[in-house]
Structure formats: structure tokens, C-alpha cells
Amino acid sequence: MGNLKSVGQEPGPPCGLGLGLGLGLCGKQGPASPAPEPSQAPAPPSPTRPAPDHSPPLTRPPDGPRFPRVKNWEVGSITYDTLSAQAQQDGPCTSRRCLGSLVFPRKLQSRPTQGPSPTEQLLGQARDFINQYYNSIKRSGSQAHEQRLQEVEAEVAATGTYQLRESELVFGAKQAWRNAPRCVGRIQWGKLQVFDARDCRTAQEMFTYICNHIKYATNRGNLRSAITVFPQRCPGRGDFRIWNSQLIRYAGYRQQDGSVRGDPANVEITELCIQHGWTPGNGRFDVLPLLLQAPDEPPELFTLPPEMVLEVPLEHPTLEWFAALGLRWYALPAVSNMLLEIGGLEFPAAPFSGWYMSSEIGMRDLCDPHRYNILEDVAVCMDLDTRTTSSLWKDKAAVEINVAVLHSYQLAKVTIVDHHAATASFMKHLENEQKARGGCPADWAWIVPPISGSLTPVFHQEMVNYFLSPAFRYQPDPWKGSAAKGAGITRKKTFKEVANAVKISASLMGTVMAKRVKATILYGSETGRAQSYAQQLGRLFRKAFDPRVLCMDEYDVVSLEHEALVLVVTSTFGNGDPPENGESFAAALMEMSGPYNSSPRPEQHKSYKIRFNSVSCSDPLVSSWRRKRKESSNTDSAGALGTLRFCVFGLGSRAYPHFCAFARAVDTRLEELGGERLLQLGQGDELCGQEEAFRGWAQAAFQAACETFCVGEDAKAAARDIFSPKRSWKRQRYRLSTQAESLQLLPGLTHVHRRKMFQATILSVENLQSSKSTRATILVRLDTGGQEGLQYQPGDHIGVCPPNRPGLVEALLSRVEDPPPSTEPVAVEQLEKGSPGGPPPGWVRDPRLPPCTLRQALTYFLDITSPPSPRLLRLLSTLAEESSEQQELEALSQDPRRYEEWKWFSCPTLLEVLEQFPSVALPAPLILTQLPLLQPRYYSVSSAPSAHPGEIHLTIAVLAYRTQDGLGPLHYGVCSTWMSQLKAGDPVPCFIRGAPSFRLPPDPNLPCILVGPGTGIAPFRGFWQDRLHDIEIKGLQPAPMTLVFGCRCSQLDHLYRDEVLDAQQRGVFGQVLTAFSRDPGSPKTYVQDLLRTELAAEVHRVLCLEQGHMFVCGDVTMATSVLQTVQRILATEGGMELDEAGDVIGVLRDQQRYHEDIFGLTLRTQEVTSRIRTQSFSLQERQLRGAVPWSFDPPGPEIPGS
């Protein structure tokens, strides 16, 4: 399809195969193994469906079924075509005659059958296709596979036919191109864009679909392969047909003297167009209108808008007179009269397009005697001797015509490929197919180009021609024979009617294109913010596309191969990991193979989390395939995701060392697998204008997608409209309805957070700090009741779902406008607009929250303590009665810098905002639909189940602080404050989140260094308890560990001092070092200082010489500083450069021997946070202006020691 011949009214290629290569080209083929040639040797049996990694045998195979032996006469290589055993149809040749040079062998034409197709025949073809599809997605034999086969069988039994799913249609259309033996450009088969037009009902709708196909495929000269599939053939109903052989063709006018002006190949269709009302011109290059036929209706005439047809005037780079010949040709070759067969289903109207091979225009269209026949005219202009063939005037003129074609298309920036590049790519395709499928059907007579035959590699390559399914097949012209049902001549349409048809088409184009261009929006989220952004993106893309919004764990990654447009919005969890609901997606994405990394390499077997943490533009692997991708062209193989266009937006915090690591990795991986990036990676920093960054990226992504798929005429206006506060929430579209059911808390939390919740109970809460300390750190002991869902291993995390403070809830309830009764469970209902063919307009329940009272929603489910987002401030501005408050809220929501300064200085709760802007009304539906969800709080488990069965211990710093530089209101940590006030027996909703990358090594003899200041000691308590159990119960003698702890003062906050000393005396620890940052009379010391001054040699020995492990737990600044210190230690002690030491740490991470458990920002990181925000402001502002790409990431700040 990369270079398609017009197959409607053109004769075949020249005969004369040369070198005897025609032998066996078209030997009679059957569904079983073909009869071998005398020179063939027996070959091994072919599996029903060869495995993708099948390699061609290079030696004579053992006895068994015989397969064609295929030789390349240029290099002498030999392969065996085992795929030919799966041929679905007999070829036209017999044992006594070769019909390989016939253009339209009658045996290969697909003709409508009288009555329904035999059920068993259709079922056999359907089963074979469904098996192919499920093999391709590696789901063969699965329950879904068996269920699909049963569905098809039942549908065929009931209706005599069946319907393909959209993914099956996409797969089938691509396979049909892949199986086309006469196409030389098949290496790009994976990049075919499939447009599903099976909902088409009229010829007018056909024309609209075709206009969109032409617009998309032409793409302002950067041609893209595409196919539009109209409804299938059905028993008892006529066909959808396109009478033209190509969507764009030049008219041929028969003159009185018998000559033809224009293209002689199109005389018949030209006369038919005139009979159906077309007013012809009299030029040599008049674009024909289209004759389109809906079932059982006469054909209708439609004129293509002139601006839709891209044409290239032909000129020569050195022959100035060539332009005066007035030659031109159209850019887009789009074959429209062939039938697409998939799984026994026939689609008589399935126009497909690619791009030209230059010799198709330069030799066949312009030089063939029965076409434009310009060869002698050009030769005369070149002063060549045309009286004798020995002057080779034809060859010389033909070369210059081809040079002119290539030059003109390249000058006009229109995609075209020369015959040398095209045939070289076909040889690569043959090699790929031999490895993947064991063979490749190819018609030598059509593959060898009509110029420079033996100068191209395909001339010397033997080929085997056979016919697989799915396939493109020839079919009779619709106005001839039995196909002419309903093809009567209609009255001539007036010019006004034709013009109106064009006008109607133009108005419908965007609507219909949107109807069939689907967009998948995937999100991975820990806090719900990525989900909220994805839903906003869905509302935006609904303006011009058919979007669906899915969580990553609800999506089958194999569907990526059949997607046209995917947008990803994802956060990054902890130390650069995927969010939990993105882990399965990440793993599956890593397992896929791409066009530039298909060979197995050790580095590709890294843990997907580890590789995600390290993927960057400087990664040698990434740089290698990115260079190959940049150098690729239309003659290179497409990847598994060749038709995919994608955009990625990442959410994160630049305070973390792996900022947006998962989003970066998804963006990198999708490109690596062959996808086309529409927009550079977008990144939203929670420290600086995240929402504004998302809005700017979303609008840019929407505009890029609209331009790519030729939809959405006013993309910018649509984007502005969707982000308007008046559009995002309207009073009249929401209402409260009373519900009979009352809230059950655990099921309610399970519903909201989409994960199973369990109830533990408090055993005790103990303050670990001295009574003289002004701060508090508590040890919380929970009773799990032996519940299986609360089982854990040391190093794992627990998620706790806290309630909001009752006083804060009551104060907010007093501000609610017209609240429902306090004890009455309610649910929010939203007024949904109806859609044609969809559900009617009506009130639909919002599923975000379970039925509950407003007080319960504010207590358990909604976040009322975090500063309101700019989007929420914009909504509140529309509800303010005072104009000054409305203007202030609007200004805060629109100015990112002003908003960030306000947020970080005041850190206001929702109640404090309402107190600052008292005229704001607060409707209950707005609270229930627009406030963010109250997120679980994660803590490292501080116990070992072997030491405390049925219990979970937590070490929690109780948070309390004043905003506005210590002069503002007192704020409390939601979870830590709540847990500090609990009593024995109180319930705690919670769940376990495993941390498999932060666990002690299975071999207890490996040395370990543990580094954790403050509450960073929490997971290590579980470690030493587990080791004590190994020593005293199991009788093991593990290698002593080294603990490096840090706190402020030895007399106030030295956590677990007695426990640590006891563990050291009993053999768990070899060394225990403590850094005090504020001890009176002692220098300020941090844990990284102890590593550098006391443990440098041991760090190097443990990590580089003894295969040991290092564990670091703490906030982001401490973890980063420790990492930098370890890097310097390895460089100094190991005698290496700093960069080399960094590579060593990368290897340690790959081997999972350097472990980090990083928790969020604390009050100590405020200085660093402020500095990061300051650096990020200018970046964000430049991104929004378009001055820098979205993926630009400045160097991280220098982070001081903790």
C-alpha cells in the first residue's frame, strides 16, 4: 500500500521474468502443502500457525511435508516457505498452464453469491480468523477466546453472518495488507490507520467518510496509509459500492476521431459520470467526481472539493522546458474498487490509500502507450533519435521522466518513494516475515518494478505466490453483470444540487470523523488527582472525538496495537514507581517488543520498576533506538504500535529525585514500541502550578490531535470553553436525591478508593518522645484480628483512612447553602444530555460517593484541609455575591505565581477560604462533586509478624504547625492527630500495600547498612525484630547489620534507644551510630556526615566487595543527600570518577541492593521546596508561552543535607 497500482482499468506488468525465476512462481497452489519443484527437498512440518520467533531453515530439512525452496540468486541464500501451507484459496494456474501474468484472473475475482453463504464454510473461515486474532494478542486458548468463538457460532446460526469487533476489524485490515502478494510496500503494514464506517447508511454519508479519508491520508503532503471500511455484504441486501477504481482519478474524454483527451484508462467511468449528471470539462487533468452506491439504490454523483485534492505540477531539475509540458499528477493513490475479505465476511467498499512509488507515475501512468503516452514527446524535446530502438531513446526519456516525478514530489514536500528504496524495503520485509511467519506471499511479476528490473534486489529473489486470508480481492465492476443491481441511470442533478452535496459534506466532515475516531484516556493515580485530570481531558476530547476514560488496571495492554489515539495521565509513586493501579500496565508494557529493540539484550530484562526509574534521554539504549527512529522512513518496518498516536502527562513533585519517572517511562516506552508522539511529555509539579501546567498541556494535546486527525475546526475555542468554570459546573445540572440505604463505612471506603478495606482496632498509643519535648512521635499498636488481608512482611506499608476533625466538619456544614437534613442519606444526580442512538436525556446518579449524609461525606470521604485548587477557586468565584471577592478569586485562579505564593504562605483550608470570602455561597451538590477525595495516609510498618503475630505497629510523627510564617492559624495533620487521640478498642480502617523492593535479602549472611533519621527508623524496627526471631527461634547466625540513626537531641527524641541497644547486645547489630543535629554542646551532625566520616570504607566494602545491601528511609531531602554522599564515597574509596560511581549506584539499584523508602515533604523541607518552586515558575511560564517543549526538565536543585 505504500505504492499502490490502480487495479481497476490498467493492464498488468510486463512479462519476461528473466533468469528462469518464473519457475514455480505460480505453480498450482492448494490449501494443503504445494507440490514441490524437482529441485525442492523435503521440509519440516509446518505448525498450524508458526510461532513469531520461527527462523528460516538454511539447510535441507528432514523428510516430511514438502515446502517451496526459495533461492536468492544474488547472494545464494536459501529459505523454505512454510507459510504457503496455509494458503486459503487455489491460484489461477493449473499443472499444465501458468496464468501468473494475468491481471484479473477470473478465479481470483470475488463475486456476489446468490442467497446466503453456506454456514459451515463461513464458520470455518470465521474460526480461522478468530484464532489468528487471539494468537496475535497472545490469548490463544483463553476463556475470552473460547467465549468469542461461541459468540460467533451463535450469531452465524441465528443470522447467517456475524459482526467483527472493532479491534478484530483493525487487525483484519492490517493482515489483508500484509497478505497482499502484489504490493511491494508492505513493510509498513502495521501503520495502516483503520477507519470504521460500518455505521454508514447512505451514499451521502459514504461521501462524507471518503472526504475525511482523503483529508486525513493527504495530511498536507505528508501522506499516511489509511483504509475506510464500509458495511459488509449481507444476505438479501445489495452492496455498498464505489464505482471509481480510485478515489482520485483524471477523466478521459473520447474524441470524435477516436483519440482520448485525458487518461484513456478512465474513459468508461468518465462516460458513466456524465450519464449521472456530471458536467465535464475538457482538460487533460480533470479530477473525476465519485459515483457512490448505497444498497439497492442507484448510484449518486459527488464532486470532490478542489481544495481537498492535492496535485503536483511536474518539472525537471535540469530540463527547463519540461514544466512547459503542463504535466501534473495527484498526490494520493487511493484504490477504491477492491473487496476486503476478513474471516469470510466481505466488504465490497473499503477504499485504502498509501503513497506512490515514483515509477508508477513516471513509467506506467505517463509512459504506457494506452495511458498518457508522453514518452516520444519527451524524447523529441531531448533531441533523441527516435527512428531506431538501438539509440535507447525510450530508456533515456523514461529515466528523465522518473527524475522529474521524484524531483517534483520532493519539491512539493509530498511523500513518494523511488523504486530502489521500495524494493530494498521489500527485501527487508521478506526477511522479517520469514522470521515471524515462515514465509511471505509475493507475486514476482508485480513486485519487480517496471524500470531498472535487474538493478533492484527483488529481481534476483525467487518468490512464492499464494493467497491467505484476510485479503484484498478483485471484484466485478458494479455496473456490469449481476453486480449491476440498482445501478439504473438517475436523472442529471442540477449544479445547485451538486454544490449543495459538497456543502453538506463539508459541514458533516468533522462530525462524522469524530464519530469514528476513538480516543482512549488512561490514568494511573494514587490520590485521585490524575483521575480527575483524565476526566477533564475526556470532557475536552468529547468535543471532537469519541473518548473513553479508563484506569490503567482496567485496560488490556494488547489493545494498544489497535488504538488510534491514546492519552495517558499518571502520577509517580514513592521512589519513581508506578502508582499501584498502574503496576500491571507497566509490567505488560515492558514485555512488549518494539521495532528498534527486538533482539534480546540483558539490559532489557531489568525489573520494570528499576528501568522506569532510570530511563532518561541520556540512557544509551534509548539514545540508540531513538536515533534509529529518527533515521527511519516509509520504507522501514513499523513497530507493534505503528498506528498509535499518543500524549503523556505526568504528575509529581520536583522535590523527589525521580520526578515524573513513571510518566517519562510510559512516554519513552510507547515511542520505543513504534508509537507516534503528538506532543512532548507534559509534567505538572505539585509545588508549582500543576493545574495550570495541565490545562496548557491539555489544550496543546487537543489541538495536536485535532490537526492529526483533521477534526475540530475550532480546537482552541473548544478547549477554552471546556475549562471555563461556567461550563464545568452548573447549578441546574445537579441535584440531591434522598436514599433509603444508610452508610456502611468499610464498604463505602472500598467503593471510593477502589480497594478492599479492613478494620483493625487500637491496642495502645504511646508517645515515644520525652515529656519535655514540644513535639510528639507515637507508637501505635493495632490488632488485626488475624485477617488475611492485613498480613504483611517487614518493610511493607499500611494505608490508613482517617476522618476529618469534627469541629472543622461542623463549621463547614454551617456554611452550606440549603443543606439536606443532617441524618438523611443523599446521592448526587447529574442531568445528562441525550445523544443520537444513545440514552435519552435524564438524571443519572454520580457514582463517585456512596449514599451518605452530608456530614458523613465531609467526615470520611472529602478533603477539606488541603488548599483549594485553581479550578475550585474559579468555581467559587462564580458563586461569590460580592464583585470584589469574585475578582480576587478569579485573579488567584488565573495567575499561577500569585496562586502558588498564596497557597504556600497561607496553606488555607476550605473553611479558611470561605472565611476570607464570606459572600461565596456553597451548594451541597458542589461540595459532593467538586471537592477532592480524602486520601489514605501511608506509613511504614514498624513491626515483624514473627515477633508480634496479629499486630501491626506504626511509628508516626504527630504534625501540628502554624501557617503564615508562624503567625497564622494552627493546622493539624489529619491522620497523625486523629491517631494520637485514639483509645484502646477504637476502629481504624486500613489496608496493606506491599513494598517488595524494600525487604531484607533472603540470604541472612549478606551484610546490610540501614540509614534512617527520625521516623525513618520505622521499617528498620521490623527488620531487627525479624532478625531477633531468626537468632533466637530459628537458631540462625545472620551477619550483623549496621544502623545509622539521626535525631535532634539525645534526651528528647532518640526513638527506640533501649530496643536498639538490646538488639545490638543480642547480635542483630554490629554497629549503631547516631547523629544529633541539635544536641547542646555538640556539633550539628547528620546521618550522611556519619557515613562520610565513620563508615566510608564499610560502605564501599559492603556494596562493592561483599554483595551487601543498603537501606535508606526518610524524607526526600535526606534520601537525596545520602545518595550523593554514597556516590562520593564509592568514587573516593573505589578510585573512580564521580560519573562512574553514579553508574555503580545504577547497577546496585538494578540488582535491588540499594533500597530507598522515601516519604513526602515535611516541615524541614520547606526551604528546599521554596527554592524548587522558584526555579520551576520560569519553566512553567515558558512552557505555557510555547518557548520550551513540555518535556524540558531543568537540572535539579542542590539539596542540602538533612
Curated annotation (Swiss-Prot):
Residue positions where Phosphoserine is found in the record: S614, S632, S637, S835, S1176, S1178
Domain (FAD-binding FR-type): give its ranges.
Answer: 755-1001
Q: Where do Pro residues bias regions lie?
A: 33-65
Q: Which organism is it from?
A: Mus musculus (Mouse)
Q: Where is the composition biased (Gly residues)?
A: 15-27
Residues given in the record as FMN binding sites: S525, E526, T527, R529, S571, T572, S653, C660, E686, Q690
Lipid-bearing positions (S-palmitoyl cysteine): C15, C26
Q: By what name is this protein known?
A: Nitric oxide synthase 3
Q: What does this protein do?
A: Produces nitric oxide (NO) which is implicated in vascular smooth muscle relaxation through a cGMP-mediated signal transduction pathway. NO mediates vascular endothelial growth factor (VEGF)-induced angiogenesis in coronary vessels and promotes blood clotting through the activation of platelets. May play a significant role in normal and abnormal limb development.
Alphabetical UniProt keywords: Calcium, Calmodulin-binding, Cell membrane, Cytoplasm, Cytoskeleton, FAD, Flavoprotein, FMN, Golgi apparatus, Heme, Iron, Lipoprotein, Membrane, Metal-binding, Myristate, NADP, Oxidoreductase, Palmitate, Phosphoprotein, Zinc
The root-end lineage is: Eukaryota, Metazoa, Chordata, Craniata, Vertebrata
Q: Which cofactor does it need?
A: heme b; FAD; FMN; (6R)-L-erythro-5,6,7,8-tetrahydrobiopterin
